[in-house]
Amino acid sequence: MITWSFIDLWRTSHSTLFQMTLATVLMAPVLGDCGPPPLLPFASPTNQLYESTTFPSGTVLKYTCHHGFKRVNSSHLSCDENGSWVYSTFCARKRCKNPGELVNGKVEIPSDLLVGSIIEFSCSKGYLLIGSATSRCEVQGKGVDWSDSLPECVIATCEPPPPISNGKHSGRDDDLYTFGSVVIYNCDPTFTLLGNASIVCTVVNRTVGVWRPHPPACQKIVCHRPQIPKGYLAPGFRQFYAYRDALEIRCKKGFILRGSSVIHCEANGEWFPSIPTCEPNGCTNIPDISYASWEGYKFPLRNFEVFEIGAKLKYQCKPGYRASLNDPQTVTCQENLTWSSTNGCERICCPTPDMEKIKIVSERRDFTGTCIYAYGDYVFYICNEGSYPMSTDGRSSCQADGKWDPAIPSCQADSGLQNRLALFTFPNISETNVTNKTYLFGHEENSTEHAMKGVCLKPMVINGNLSVERVIYAELENITIQCDPGYTIVGSPNIICSNRTWYPEVPSCQMEVLEDCRIVSRGAQLLHCLSSPEDVHRALKVYKLFLEIERLEHQKEKWIQLHRKPQSMKINRSFRLCN
């Protein structure tokens, strides 16, 4: 619309002013008219307007509500003096009826039930929707109604569960598998189930029933018993293990576990996590202490044993040895897994006798050690004229405490001893050589008588041999006895002449009888002629006694032969097995 101000009109030319005045006069009759009425979405004019384009002020038009709408106010439009159509909303949307309840489902109404509204349908879990999932409130004839009727919710069903190799499920072919149905799979013997043993009928995308999860598989799975040096299996062990079997692993004392203490047999036949190891957490390689033994251990300690940190081992020196000065005689396992140091054991020496006052007849000495005389060494000695040995037999031994027993080889004066001269030859016996020494005792008319008081007669050992064959043996002379083949020595093989007596006593040689072999041989023959095992047992006892008598008789005959006496008549004790 073009507007002009009053001042502008007076500034225009006379011709323009005339034209505007004329237009004002001509337009005066239509200043209050209205144009065509508005197009309403809910109503239309009742009467046809015949393409009228202008309506005078005060014109009233009647409207009719569209289908799906109903009148709620005056349905008139008025043209006011300003040339505008005046009206209020007089038609409202009609309402569809309530759709009702959906069995095993629900109806969702987003806003309202008025015409044009859309409602949605959904089924409960495990049910499938049969029908339309939505419905629209629309005009139908002169009224309104829903475009789609209520759908139906039916329970979902699944196909029969699939079979598996080397196994079966709990269902039957004629079963109806609905939502929530469960079947359980089992494997044949010696097969292991991989996966979930049970599957469930469920719904996917609200449209189809399927089994979830996927059926399991049956396979042969074997895990071998793990080898864990210095470790062991806590609950015991088997040679083979099946899928998902668990093992608890522990380490022996002195070792620490590196890795997981619990492992499981996996589907690939391997253990998971990986098999752990047992590593030393203590000291090994026990110190080798010469001339010592470990206290509290009956058998020698083994180097593969492991001792915990802080463990202490106490050792004892062997007889003839003692701990070094200020040594605690213990070793300790330290944090660096090594043993503390020790000085060990040192040899105990016996004092050396005064060689100017004694004469050694025989001795045993260890020439490889640091001592002249050490534990186990001994000497046989005589004294110079006018004295006699401190020990009764002229023998003294070096003891473990470093002292001589009975006393250090020495001599003491004999005021009643007369001069005697006797000449004897004694063996000087050592570990490496044997020589003869001559000693002067004195002389007298009866020197031979006195000398014979110190000799020994030849020992009689039946079925045995002497290392030195003589008729008589000198005082302090020692010999060795060895038995003939088939005989065993009973007693000490080494004896020494002391005060006209052999010390220790002369041993004997006893025959080695293989009684078991002879008894078994006889028993095999007895079984052929005796009726019962009890008779055989008694017969074997009698035969064993017969063998003992026969052995004693044999020894008696040999002794008689050696002493050149008339031989005894041998008794015939033949043992008849069967008549």
From Swiss-Prot:
Provenance organism: Mus musculus
What the entry lists under Pfam families is as follows: C4bp_oligo (PF18453), Sushi (PF00084)
Listed under GO biological process in this entry are: binding of sperm to zona pellucida; single fertilization
Keywords, comma-separated and alphabetical = Cytoplasmic vesicle, Disulfide bond, Fertilization, Glycoprotein, Repeat, Signal, Sushi
Q: Which residues are glycosylated?
A: 73, 82, 196, 205, 336, 428, 433, 436, 446, 465, 478, 499, 572
List the GO terms this entry assigns under cellular component, sorted alphabetically: acrosomal lumen; acrosomal matrix; acrosomal vesicle; cell body; cytoplasmic vesicle; outer acrosomal membrane; plasma membrane; zona pellucida receptor complex
Q: Where in the cell is it found?
A: Cytoplasmic vesicle, Secretory vesicle, Acrosome lumen
Q: How does it assemble?
A: Homomultimer; disulfide-linked.
- Free-text function comment from the UniProt entry: Binds to ZP3 glycoprotein in egg zona pellucida. Probably involved in interactions between sperm acrosome and egg zona pellucida during and immediately following the acrosome reaction.
Gene3D superfamilies given in the database record = 1.20.5.3730, 2.20.28.230, Complement Module, domain 1
Keyword Glycoprotein in annotation:
yes
Chief localisation class: cytoplasm
Give the domain of life: Eukaryota
Q: How is it modified after translation?
A: Glycosylated.
Q: Could you read off the lineage of the organism from its UniProt record?
A: Eukaryota, Metazoa, Chordata, Craniata, Vertebrata
Q: In which tissues is it expressed?
A: Testis-specific. Not expressed in heart, liver, abdominal muscle, lung, brain or kidney.
As given in the record, the signal peptide range reads 1-32
The segment(s) forming the Sushi domain are 33-93, 94-155, 156-220, 221-280, 281-347, 348-413, 454-511
Q: What is this protein called?
A: Zona pellucida sperm-binding protein 3 receptor
The disulfide bonds in this chain are 34-79, 65-91, 96-137, 123-153, 158-201, 187-218, 223-265, 251-278, 283-333, 317-345, 350-398, 383-411, 456-497, 483-509
